Every structure is written in C-alpha cells, then in structure tokens.
Amino acid sequence: MAAAAGMLLLGLLQAGGSVLGQAMEKVTGGNLLSMLLIACAFTLSLVYLIRLAAGHLVQLPAGVKSPPYIFSPIPFLGHAIAFGKSPIEFLENAYEKYGPVFSFTMVGKTFTYLLGSDAAALLFNSKNEDLNAEDVYSRLTTPVFGKGVAYDVPNPVFLEQKKMLKSGLNIAHFKQHVSIIEKETKEYFESWGESGEKNVFEALSELIILTASHCLHGKEIRSQLNEKVAQLYADLDGGFSHAAWLLPGWLPLPSFRRRDRAHREIKDIFYKAIQKRRQSQEKIDDILQTLLDATYKDGRPLTDDEVAGMLIGLLLAGQHTSSTTSAWMGFFLARDKTLQKKCYLEQKTVCGENLPPLTYDQLKDLNLLDRCIKETLRLRPPIMIMMRMARTPQTVAGYTIPPGHQVCVSPTVNQRLKDSWVERLDFNPDRYLQDNPASGEKFAYVPFGAGRHRCIGENFAYVQIKTIWSTMLRLYEFDLIDGYFPTVNYTTMIHTPENPVIRYKRRSK
C-alpha cells in the first residue's frame, strides 16, 4: 500500500509539473510574479493532497481514541473561513458540542484544542521534545528577531538566553524605569492639548515603543528613535502576520520585503550602539550591559548579533501585550466612569493629594489599578492562541493526539468559560479580591502563558502599564464617543480594538 501511494504521489508531481508549466505560460503571459503565485497555490494544494494520502496510511493502534474531529467539506481550507471570521464563537460552540478536546483542519493543518484548565495542563506541563514550540513559531520569529536567538536555536540555548534577559528584568531596574516611563508619557501627551478625540491604540503603541526602548535598550539606542526608526519598528512588527505564518518566507511580498529591510537597518543601529558601549568601557546598569556581560554555561559570551536579536525580541514581544492591554483598559475605564474616578482617587490616596512623581513602591500599592489590568487581560488577552507541535503521541481526557497536530490553548476562551468564572463576561476587577476567582483552577487564567514558556516580561509589563495609566489618569478624563465600545479586530495576529478612538479632556488643576 505504501509503495502504491508513493507511485501515486510521484505521478501527481510529474503530471502536475507538466500541466503547470504549460498553463502558466498561457495564463500569465510569462509574468514572473503571477507565475510564482500560481506555483505557490499549486504547491500548497499538492502538499495538502500528500498529507491527506499520508494520513490514510497511518493506522491508530487498537483501543486508541483520537479526539473528536469537526468535519469540513471544504478541502485544504477546512474551517479557516468560519474560524477567521469569529474564532472565539467557533471555539466556544465546539467546546459546548464536543467537550474540552477536539480537532479540526485549516489550510492543510490539523489543530487540536485543549479548552479548560484540566485539558490545558497537557500543554503547559509538557516537555519541549513532546510538544514543541520552535516547530510552530520559528517561521514567524526568525525573520523578525534574526538567526541564533529565540526559536531559531535548540530549546536549552533559548532557555539560557531567557535566563540572561530575566536577570536584567529585576526590581532595581524597575525602580529606575518608573521615572523614565513617567517622563516619556508626560512628554508624549503634551501634543494632545486640552481635549479632543484620538486613536488611543496608535498613541499607546508609539508610547510603548518609546518607553520600552528607553528602559530595555538603553539611552544610546533610545536617542536614535526618531520617526524613521519608529517606522522601521512598525515594518518589522508587520512580520507577525497571518501571511508570514502560512506562506514561505522567500515570497517577494511587500510586507516581507519591508520586514527584512527593517531588520537589517535596526540591527545596524544596534551594532553601532553595542560597539560604542564596548569601546567606552563604561559600565551602565541596564539590560544592554547585562547582555554584554552575560555568558553561556560553557563560558562563551554573546555575539553582537545575538545581543541585537535578543534586544529586538525583548522589545517586540512585550510591545504587543502592553499596547493592546493598555488600549483595551482605556475603553473599559471610559465605559465605567465610576471605576475611572475610583482609579483617579486611588492615585491621591496612595501617592498624595498633590500627586508627586511616581515611585516603584507607590506603584505596588495601586491595587485597584492592578486589578483593572488583570481583568483587562482576562477579557482581552492580546494573544488569543498558544500553540505547540506534537512530536510524540499525547494523551489527554481519554484521547490520543497523534504527532503532527498543532496543539493549542486559547487563553481568551479559558478565561471566560462559564464552568470557571462567575459573571464571566462582566468587567469586574473586584473579583480578584478573592483568593481563587476561577474556582481555584490552575490554568484558567493564563494571559502570560505558564510553564517553561511563561512570558519573562510580565513584571515589566505591569510596571510599564501601571506607570503609563497612572500618568494618563492624572492628566485626563476619558469618555466613549457616543457610547461606542470597540469590537475585536480578528484580522491581525494580536487581537486589537476595532476603530479605537476615545474622547479625552484635561483635568482641571
């Protein structure tokens, strides 16, 4: 059977190549880009047929149950259209019908979802050799961060790199960061004037880049962050797209070209800053210096290319979380003016009636603001899906997931399951006054992930968001425009607010 299948697939390749060559000349008139796109479409379809044929050759062992499979009559695309249109509704409906574990196909790939705390434990407790992260994320991150870092290296090396970065994300540095972020925020909002309507997501995205670059990259790199460099960051960030995940990286797409050019130019800026720091022999207590002084277990120091790649990764990985969360929280506070007033009064209670400059210790005592961030992350986690590739068979809830499946957990769904959360769709920061707001379930609340791949920048994100919003609340009152509260934009990898324009008015002194 295997030999017959192999001959069949070989025949498909030969016949397809002949037909494709003749057809492309007629249809495209020899246009290179058109021929390339048709070739890609043919290749994708052929890959799907090969996987389909190979799948039929695999026989499950007797007594092994595969997860419930949601059938689609549409070849290759599968449920991609329905899922892309409303992913949360799709997953919640599947959970109601099939339970916590189920599979379906999109664009030739099979996805198995683990919903609810018990099922999600498989992913968060797994070893990397069983449920692998690099197999899923490397094609997205490597063109953006560069080779030799993050998911482009073996997991033990990546863990060493994360440990180096984490050592620089410490309380001593956070205490320095608060005043830096407050100053950057005040300067940024000087241009807003007394009142108006602004796209708060765009504004906060720009501000997050400014503050993160200053805190995480050092003064040398921050001093070069002008409009041109900000656009380079935006182009680089554009590499985190559905197209980058689904399509080969060598395709001559405009967004891919912009990403690759931005990567080269930003690294050149970093190389100059790194060389300047090395040559000066000046020891500045920041993350750049932490990386320059760091060594692997075998004693090898980081190369300039590794340092630059890790700095890019540190900035962009956190930029999404902070900018999206900050924007969504603004709309939740604008919708609930009573809560917004309480957050403002908390500033005076904790920091003093005259609202002096913020300190790290004061920031820690802003408990209501802290709970507002937590609740925003519950209802609007920036990353809707966390994925791993199954390399070995995995058993969960009585089902066996075969190798080759992309195994997924959705924080968005887990964080509002009616089985786990009381008044699950309500924005209620006071739910965190309880010790176990999610019935004590370990993986019911995972906006920063869990286990070996938990986000190392969580504490910095809280410092950054709390400082920015403390400053914004001191400066302005915020309102929805004609009661409009944004819907979720599902067309991007990070789920941002749709048309995020907010109304503001400067507080009277």
Swiss-Prot record:
Belongs to the cytochrome P450 family. This is Lanosterol 14-alpha demethylase. Pfam families: p450 (PF00067). Its cofactor is heme. The keyword Lipid metabolism applies. The chain crosses the membrane at residues 30-50. The gene is CYP51A1. GO terms for biological process: cholesterol biosynthetic process; cholesterol biosynthetic process via 24,25-dihydrolanosterol; negative regulation of amyloid-beta clearance; negative regulation of protein catabolic process; negative regulation of protein secretion; steroid biosynthetic process; sterol metabolic process. Heme binds at residue 455. Ubiquitinated by MARCHF6, leading to proteasomal degradation. CDD domains: CYP51-like. Keywords: Cholesterol biosynthesis, Cholesterol metabolism, Endoplasmic reticulum, Heme, Iron, Lipid biosynthesis, Lipid metabolism, Membrane, Metal-binding, Microsome, Monooxygenase, Oxidoreductase, Steroid biosynthesis, Steroid metabolism, Sterol biosynthesis, Sterol metabolism, Transmembrane, Transmembrane helix, Ubl conjugation. GO terms for molecular function: heme binding; iron ion binding; oxidoreductase activity; oxidoreductase activity, acting on paired donors, with incorporation or reduction of molecular oxygen, reduced flavin or flavoprotein as one donor, and incorporation of one atom of oxygen; sterol 14-demethylase activity. It is a single-pass membrane protein. Pathway: Steroid biosynthesis; zymosterol biosynthesis; zymosterol from lanosterol: step 1/6. GO terms for cellular component: endoplasmic reticulum membrane; membrane. Inhibited by azalanstat. Inhibited by azole antifungal agents ketoconazole, itraconazole and fluconazole. It is an enzyme of class 1 (oxidoreductase). PROSITE patterns: CYTOCHROME_P450. Sterol 14alpha-demethylase that plays a critical role in the cholesterol biosynthesis pathway, being cholesterol the major sterol component in mammalian membranes as well as a precursor for bile acid and steroid hormone synthesis. It catalyses: a 14alpha-methyl steroid + 3 reduced [NADPH--hemoprotein reductase] + 3 O2 = a Delta(14) steroid + formate + 3 oxidized [NADPH--hemoprotein reductase] + 4 H2O + 4 H(+); lanosterol + 3 reduced [NADPH--hemoprotein reductase] + 3 O2 = 4,4-dimethyl-5alpha-cholesta-8,14,24-trien-3beta-ol + formate + 3 oxidized [NADPH--hemoprotein reductase] + 4 H2O + 4 H(+); 24,25-dihydrolanosterol + 3 reduced [NADPH--hemoprotein reductase] + 3 O2 = 4,4-dimethyl-8,14-cholestadien-3beta-ol + formate + 3 oxidized [NADPH--hemoprotein reductase] + 4 H2O + 4 H(+); a 14alpha-methyl steroid + reduced [NADPH--hemoprotein reductase] + O2 = a 14alpha-hydroxymethyl steroid + oxidized [NADPH--hemoprotein reductase] + H2O + H(+). Ubiquitously expressed with highest levels in testis, ovary, adrenal, prostate, liver, kidney and lung. Its EC number is 1.14.14.154. It is found in: Endoplasmic reticulum membrane; Microsome membrane.
